Amino acid sequence: MPFRAHPFRQRGFSLLEVLIAALIFAIGLLGLAGLQARMLAAANSSYERSAAVMSAYTILHAMRAAVMSTTDPGTRSTLAAAYVSSDWRCSSPSGSTLPLADLKTWIDSMRGTSTNPPLVHPSACGRVTAIDANTFTYRAEVCWNDSAGGDNTDGGNCLGGKPATIISVTSRL
C-alpha cells in the first residue's frame, strides 16, 4: 500500500461548527432587536419633547394674544394673571372666560380627548407661572411620564416625585 501524505482530509463543516455559528448569529440578531427597540423608545421620547415645546409656546402665544387684545394696563394684568397657576393642571378647567377656554384647549391637546389623540402624552400636565408680572414675563411648563427619559424626581413635579420629564419655556408677552 503506497504511503499517502494526507490519508484523510476533512471536507465541509461538522454539525457542531454549524450549530455554534447559528448560535452566535442568533445572539447577534437579538442584540440588534434590542438596539432597535431602544432606538424607537428614544425617537418617541424625542417626539414628545418636541411636541411639549410646541405646546408650551402655544399657551404663551394664546396669552400674548389675549393680553394684546386690550390697551388697558389693568385689564392686561388681570388677563395674564388668569392663566397663572402654581399647581400642575392635569385636567381641563371649566369656565367661560377666554383664559380658561385657552387653558382647556391647551390641556386637552396635550393629553388628548376621546376624539383626538394626545399631542404630548396622556399623562401630560401643564402650568403657567409668572416670572415678572410687571414686564409680562411668564414661564409655561409641560410635565409628563416619559418612560424612556424621565429624570426629574422632584416631589413637586406633576407625578408627585415619580420620574418625569419637564419642559420649560420662558417668554415675555
Regions found by a protein language model. Name each.
Residues 41-46, 50-173:
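Flexible, low-complexity segments enriched in proline/glycine/serine and punctuated by aromatic residues
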Residues 2-57:
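Aliphatic-rich helix starts adjacent to a transmembrane/signal segment
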